[in-house]
Amino acid sequence: MGMFGVAFGLGFTFGPLAGGLIAGSNYTQETLSLVAWLASAINLLNLIFVITSFKETLPKEKAIQLKKNELSKQIEVVKNPMLFPYFLLIFFIYAVFSGMEGTIAVWTKETFTWGPKEVGFVMLLAGFCQIIVQGFLLRVLIKKFDEIKLIASGFISLILGFSLIPTENIYLIPLAIVFLSYGIGISNPCINSILSKKSENNKGLVLGTGYSCQAAARFIGQPLAGFIFLNFGKNVPFYFDAVFLVMVALGYMFLYKNIRKQA
């Protein structure tokens, strides 16, 4: 799971940086359009690569059978009391994190008059931290601590990161990014690892449901953060994220106790 995070971190490192450098600090409609066209071209190349290089590993007969029972199995997975709390965790974490992703560029523009170039370097730091966390640090920590404790440390780190941003201290922003990157970088693979262990016969379906939770969280998190940003102030979304995660952590402690009783 950690290596998937490393791959994501590499993209998160160089993608925003390249886009920021191309757009520049004093961006124009033309430079922003160029970034969009380049991103589209890269996606097209990626599509061609997938079509020509990857083969379906699931036999056709099994695929047809899975399609027939897909909806019922999906419902069973979501209703599973051993899995549902972790799906909720994924949803909540990515809802607040995607909200930060959607507002941080506008926030830095209003607070520090930063442009795409400066935000690109912020994303460079975030991506680099995720590579370190998921590619190296996770391997060390997982030998000393179980996934539950690492998820808890991720929550604490996310709460600290969201709390530091509204200070509007330019020197604390890198520290906030480090906290946020550790939080998301350590929590996500640990949750996926737990889901994988608890689903011996339906790993693909369970992990796929987890990724669906991520997508749903982004669908809700970014518009909600934008609404709060516009109507209640630029710092309120980050305070909201921190307080919300504290509430989620308390609820998670309650759920985890129930899970242990059932185990």
Language-model regions: role of each:
Residues 133-146, 229:
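Helix-to-loop junctions at the C-terminal end of transmembrane segments
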Residues 146-191:
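C-terminal transmembrane helical hairpin of 12-TM major facilitator-type secondary transporters
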Residues 201-231:
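A late C-terminal transmembrane helix in Major Facilitator Superfamily
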Residues 24-40, 227-245:
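A membrane-interface helix-boundary motif in multi-pass transporters
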Residues 102-118:
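Short amphipathic helix-loop junctions that connect adjacent transmembrane helices
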Residues 41-60, 251-256:
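C-terminal membrane-cytosol helix-exit motif in multi-pass small-molecule transporters
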Residues 55-88:
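Juxtamembrane intracellular "pre-TM" segments in multi-pass secondary transporters
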